[in-house]
Structures are given as C-alpha cells and as structure tokens.
C-alpha cells in the first residue's frame, strides 16, 4: 500500500474508467472557466500553467504526463475560443508544469501577485465572472437577480457539455484510454437545472437580495450534478465488476 494513500483511494478511482469521467469533467470545468475569465477580461493567454495547493494533486489522477495534460487544456481553450470567436484562445498552446511542492508555489504566487507592476494587470478581487451567455466583463450580479440569470447559465453549461463530444477533445482523452460517452453528457444535462435550483433555493433570502453573488454561477449547474454522477458512476463500476465475475 501507498503510505500516502493507505486506503488505496486513488487506485480505486484510477482503475475505474467510470469514476475517472467525474474527475475529468471537474478538471475540464475549471479549465473552461479559466478560458471564460481570459476572454472576458481580455487577458493574454498564458504559455505555461502550474497548479498550486495540495488540492491540485488530484489532477495527477488524470495523468502525470505533462504533454498529454497540456494537449487536453489546449483543446479546452481552443473549444471555448471557437464558441466566442477568440482567435488567441483558439490558437492556445498551453504547457502544463507540475510542481513537486505545490504549497510552496502557492506561497510564492501570493508574493508575486502583490508586486508591481503585475498587480495592475490582474482581475480585481471584487470582479467576478459568472460565465452566462453574453456576459459583459465587470457586471455585478446580486442574489436578487439569480432567477433571471438561470437560462443564461444553463445555456452556458450546455455549451460546456458540448466540449466532450468535440472530436479534438475525444481524441485527446483517447490518448489516456478514456472517454465521456454521450449518455454521460446527456445525464449531466438532465441534472443541471435541479443542481442550479438547489443553490438558488439555499440563497433565496430577501436580506441577501442586494448583495453581490460571491461565487461563480457557472459552477451552480455542476455542484449537485457531479455528486449525482459520482453515485451513478460508482454503481456502474460495481455492476461491471459483478458481470466480470459471473
């Protein structure tokens, strides 16, 4: 057993193509949202990306091969670039670099971000991109506006789901022996609205109506969806194992 993973949790996930689909969708959503920010804020497309914090270690469950992960991220950026007609994103050629000490990179990044002149070129802390259709950079959305934003957010989520049936993405994932089948994508879409509604209902407080929403609405259709997909994928994996032993 791995001393850092005594319950073999990582091995359980990586040995299941069904469970790996959830990991891929989660990672892809983060990279897709990064592309949204780069587009709306009109930022220069980075040449290199490294992941910080201990939480980022889960990314290596997908692959520890930097070249393959670089290809996947570049395809995600290119897909979104095509949707919004951003030629810089379309031509993205991202190089992923893993750090042996992600916590150290986090600390160093914090110091760099506070330095001049870089600080002047960063997105302000109080400016949040939500990813809804036809969003204008810098627009504040309040909790009282949640319901009116629902259609735009779900439209955006459906476009995100289209990533996984895009030929270029299918080819990139195939290098890892993985895929996101059509029925998986369709099930995600089915859960999306109820997932959004759960977050909406949790925040439907008149006292909060005038306050700005503090987290990206882009992820609202995904929160409950990933939980439900994890349960379904786990059950599918168990069923497949039973069939193998029959």
Specify the residue positions occupied by each region the protein language model found:
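Helical "lid/coupling" subdomains associated with nucleotide-phosphate turnover
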Residues: 1-246
């Amino acid at each position: 057993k791995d001393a850092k993973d005594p319950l073999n949790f990582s091995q359980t996930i990586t040995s299941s193509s069904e469970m790996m689909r959830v990991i891929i969708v989660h990672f892809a959503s983060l990279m897709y949202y990064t592309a949204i920010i780069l587009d709306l804020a009109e930022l220069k497309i980075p040449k290199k990306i490294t992941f910080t914090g201990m939480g980022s270690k889960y990314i290596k469950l997908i692959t520890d091969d930097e070249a393959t992960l670089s290809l996947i991220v570049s395809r995600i950026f290119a897909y979104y670039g095509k949707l919004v007609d951003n030629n810089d994103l379309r031509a993205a050629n991202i190089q992923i670099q893993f750090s042996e000490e992600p916590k150290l990179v986090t600390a160093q990044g914090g110091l760099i971000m506070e330095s001049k002149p870089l600080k002047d070129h960063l997105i302000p802390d109080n400016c949040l991109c939500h990813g809804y259709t036809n969003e204008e950079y810098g627009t504040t959305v309040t909790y009282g506006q949640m319901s009116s934003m629902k259609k735009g957010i779900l439209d955006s989520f459906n476009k995100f789901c289209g990533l996984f049936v895009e030929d270029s993405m299918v080819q990139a994932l195939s290098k890892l022996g993985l895929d996101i089948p059509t029925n998986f994508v369709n099930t995600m879409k089915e859960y999306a609205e109820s997932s959004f509604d759960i977050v909406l209902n949790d925040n439907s407080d008149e006292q909060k109506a005038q306050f700005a929403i503090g987290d990206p609405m882009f992820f609202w259709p995904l929160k409950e969806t990933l939980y439900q997909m994890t349960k379904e994928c786990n059950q599918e994996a168990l069923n497949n194992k039973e069939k193998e032993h029959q």
